[in-house]
Amino acid sequence: MARAAPGSGASPLPLLPALALGLVILHCVVADGNSTRSPEDDGLLCGDHAENCPATTTQPKRRGHFSRCPKQYKHYCIKGRCRFVVAEQTPSCVCDEGYAGARCERVDLFYLRGDRGQILVICLIAVMVIFIILVVSICTCCHPLRKRRKRRKKEEEMETLGKDITPINDDIQETSIA
């Protein structure tokens, strides 16, 4: 029976929970906030090659997707700041830290998302430390068992070898031929 070299038969099974946890945490880290961001480029583009328009044009510059909320929506957002979506003619909210929802009505338990990258690194390090501790514990427990098994096997071999050799003194009788 051929035995695999030590360390070559490592099962990928313990890595699956770590991989799953990493993917879940990555999904949380990649998730965006709860509002649409305004465009960063306020300039107008014209022409086929998306070049900037000359400064002499009289076209008004776009201010963005949002404007101030009308007075009728003054208290529309419960825990946040109101802004008006120009294209849809509807109010929208920019929630205060720790709140979420269309009108900032829900408490966001995971509002410490600013440090998501740091949380991801800490979680991955913790998983790796737990994995290393698990591997060291398994090796520490298995090594004495292997030694004991080898010792028993060696003792059994010695016993079987000892039984096969018949004692010389018991079976041989001396005869005198002279």
From Swiss-Prot:
Residues bearing glycans: N34
An individual GO BP term: positive regulation of cell population proliferation
Organism: Bos taurus
Tissue and organ expression note: Expressed in a wide range of tissues, including the mammary gland.
Gene that specifies this protein: BTC
Any one GO cellular component localisation term in the record: extracellular space
Signal sequence, start to end: 1-31
Ranges facing Extracellular side: 32-118
Gene Ontology MF: a single term: epidermal growth factor receptor binding
Protein name, per record: Probetacellulin
Coiled coil regions in record: none
InterPro entries noted in UniProt: EGF-like_dom
